[in-house]
Each structure stands twice: as structure tokens, then as C-alpha cells.
A protein has these predicted regions:
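Positively charged, low-complexity intrinsically disordered leader regions
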Residues: 2-21
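Short, glycine-rich nucleotide/cofactor-binding loops
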Residues: 29-40, 69, 112-116
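Histidine-anchored nucleotide/phosphate-binding helix
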Residues: 41-54, 59
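Short internal beta-strands
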Residues: 57-63, 136-139
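N-terminal beta-loop-helix "entrance" segment that forms/cooperates
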Residues: 65-78
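A glycine-rich helix N-cap at a beta->alpha junction
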Residues: 77-109, 113, 117
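A charged, amphipathic interaction segment
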Residues: 104-163, 167-168
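A hydrophobic membrane-anchoring alpha-helix module
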Residues: 173-179
Length: 179
């Protein structure tokens, strides 16, 4: 014989906590280790967004990310086409590796960003600096690539160690973002 259970309504009162503070994120430290156009812009856009939202933003560039903050390369970054699975997925790697294709892809990307009124890299750094953001270069990577303070954009505040970088991130409400 099968027993049946009576259905009884279940009611419960659940208190939902009300957020007293606007946000717990007070500052961001964005570490950029890559020097491709899309990675550098991701870091710049996130830092700018944090600053516009009233948060502190600091950028730390290391290894190939240093290309983004050198006077020589800042406005000449490229989009990686070979080995980038997100770049036109249906395109064979052979086509993406053809001479001139990376330059063409970078040109098209910059053209689309220009349509959206996204500033060039050096102008973006100037905006971030003017809004109170701070830009740093990694000491070890700078030494490895034989770069000096004079090689970097004027907006680069200093060349610092990894320990110094962690000190920048110290405190409650601090978030590290690695690109």
C-alpha cells in the first residue's frame, strides 16, 4: 500500500541584509603583463571606470606590458592574430599569420575604437593620470629589457618592485586584477 503525504504550505521569513555602504571595493590595482592592444585597453578601461566611479586605481605594468608605457611603443600596439583563439574563430591560423594581416587587424580594431570615441593609448594614460590614477613600471622587467625612467611615458609615476606593488594594494576594500 502506498501512503500519501498531505501537502502543507511552507512559509518562512527571510531577512535580506541591507547594504549600508555603497560598495566594498575602494581601490583596484590592475596588473598588466601583456602588451597587445586588447589587453592594454582592457586595463585602461577598467582603471578609468574605477576612477570615474570614485575609486582609487593603480596600474602596474610588467614584462611585455611595459611596451604599453614606453614612449616608443605606446601608440603602436598590435592585436595578436596568431594563436589567439578568440580572434575570428573560423579563420585558419595560416591566414592570420600572413604578412601584413596583424597590422591590418590592428588598424581595423583602432578604427572601430575611434568610431566609439575611445582615445588612443597615450591620451588614455593622460586621462587616467589627470583623474588621480597612478601608473607604475615593474623594476625587474624594466631591468630585464634595459629600460630606464626616460624610456617611459611622463605619466609613469615610478619604477617599483613587486613588494612595493603589494604595498600599493594594502588595505581593506582593495582588489587585484591581473591581465
Amino acid at each position: 500500500m502506498v501512503e500519501t503525504l498531505e501537502k502543507t504550505p511552507v512559509t518562512a521569513t527571510v531577512e535580506v541584509p541591507v547594504k549600508q555602504e555603497r560598495d566594498t571595493v575602494k581601490k583596484v590595482l590592475i596588473i598588466c603583463s601583456k602588451g597587445t592592444l586588447e589587453d592594454v585597453y582592457a586595463a585602461l578601461i577598467m582603471a578609468n571606470g574605477a576612477l570615474m566611479d570614485g575609486r582609487d586605481a593603480k596600474l602596474f605594468f610588467t614584462f611585455f606590458g611595459l611596451n604599453a608605457i614606453t614612449k616608443k611603443n605606446a601608440d603602436h600596439l598590435h592585436t595578436a592574430t596568431v594563436g589567439n583563439p578568440a580572434f575570428m574563430p573560423a579563420m585558419p591560423t595560416l591566414v592570420a599569420g600572413l604578412p601584413g594581416f596583424e597590422a591590418f587587424a590592428s588598424y581595423m580594431m583602432k578604427k572601430e575604437m575611434d568610431k566609439l570615441d575611445i582615445p588612443p593609448v597615450t591620451e588614455f594614460f593622460q586621462m587616467i593620470d589627470a583623474a588621480g590614477g597612478e601608473i607604475y613600471a615593474c623594476k625587474l622587467a624594466a631591468e630585464m629589457f634595459k629600460l630606464n625612467k626616460e624610456d617611459f611615458l611622463d605619466e609613469v609615476k615610478d619604477i617599483i618592485t613587486v613588494g612595493d606593488m603589494y604595498a600599493l594594494a594594502d588595505g581593506d576594500g582593495s582588489h587585484l586584477i591581473f591581465i
